[in-house]
Amino acid sequence: MFTLLPYQQRALDAVQTNTKGCVYVPTGGGKTVIMMEDAKQRIARASKPLTFVIVAPRILLANQLCGEFEEYLDNKDIHYMHCHSGETHHFKSTNPELIKLFATTAKVGGEHCFIFTTYNSIHKVNDSKVDVDVVYFDEAHHCVKKNNFVGIAQTSADANNSYFFTATPKYHGGVESMNNTSVYGNNIISIPAQELIDAGSIIPPKVVSYESQDTRSRENAAWVDGKNVVGILRGITDTDAPKVLVASPSSKCIWEMFTETDVLFQLKDMGYTIMHITSKHGAYIDKTKVSREVFFEKMSEFGADPDKKFIVFHYSILSEGMNVHGLTHCIMLRNLPVIEMAQTVGRVIRMHRDDRKAIADGKMKAGEFAFYKKPCGHVVIPTNNNYGDRIIKQLQNVVDTIFVKGEVPIA
């Protein structure tokens, strides 16, 4: 039987005693587990079939969430569907009439319905007029985008229960702001990052500068970025099987790095499996184009393999929500907004599975980093002649806000 950590139980209690509200939990704290356990308990108490909607910012994350819910709930009396334009082995449609038909068929059959969708497609669920019992908004800071807000405001108003989960809330002066309680409800709980570290859920990040030998310009960006990535990888000595995420400046930079330099040859020579994903070019593993589902499955497989070396290049796709197991390092080749910066840090502060198990088995205590296989998550930034210094300063400020002051980073 799965046991929630104390802070997760408090968050679950907050959800179950409020019909609407914001749940702020740092990245790596298991927000999805809180959603899934809430759904599981509601189903166990239900006297009639329930309809759940789970909203994610990206198709890849919607698919990941669906897989996690399926495994966690392990219930044959549940029908799963997707409402987005991406790939899935489940039934999918953005046609409101078909969405309504699917949900109604499940209900008539006495079974529960889960609809996984994106912020871009939530209006299709609204148009279907499906009676929604519970909606979970994942990475809910995306709600404040003007083209998302109308849809989520309607969903929040129509659903019986609405919950907004994020590590990085976004406040501003407009009606879309997450402090608009008529749409988002109140902040029903906020968990400090130190509590997650003390519980053995995450590890602290370590900001590292890499002194580049070359001055980066628009003309030589691909060449310098590629050289810096290789140099950083050659300098990794704390693990024999680095698992590295690269936050790239643009899809164009990734493509030029691969087609105009020898970086692919060097990475293969170093024993790395090379993965990259962008909205423009799709997903690739070692020059072979694959579906997003296969890409995600392989990321999970490689992350769980203690001997596997791999590197993932992305542009603004894997920064948030994606559960890439085992990442040891992140190379930040571009400046990022505060929210995306905090989310990127979150990719590398997940606990090593062996460390998590050792703590659970009582072989060591949470926070005894000297005994951890993975005592910290490295975030590396290339610098040269003041280039990169501002990024490091901003990143360190974000890290201090979250991990030293214990505050929620609000943009």
Predicted regions and their residues:
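Conserved RecA-like ASCE ATPase "motif II neighborhood" in helicase/translocase motors
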Residues: 102-152, 314-316
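Post-DEXD/H (motif II) to motif III coupling segment of the RecA-like Helicase ATP-binding lobe
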Residues: 142-202
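Walker A/P-loop
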Residues: 18-38
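N-terminal pre-P-loop "Q-motif" helix
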Residues: 1-19
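Conserved RecA-like P-loop NTPase helicase motor core
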Residues: 142, 281-409
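Conserved helix-turn-beta segment of the N-terminal RecA-like "Helicase ATP-binding" lobe
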Residues: 60-95
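Conserved Walker A/P-loop ATP-binding site and its immediately adjacent core
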Residues: 33-37, 48-71, 249-255
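Conserved interdomain linker/interface between the two RecA-like ATPase lobes of SF2 helicase motors
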Residues: 186-260
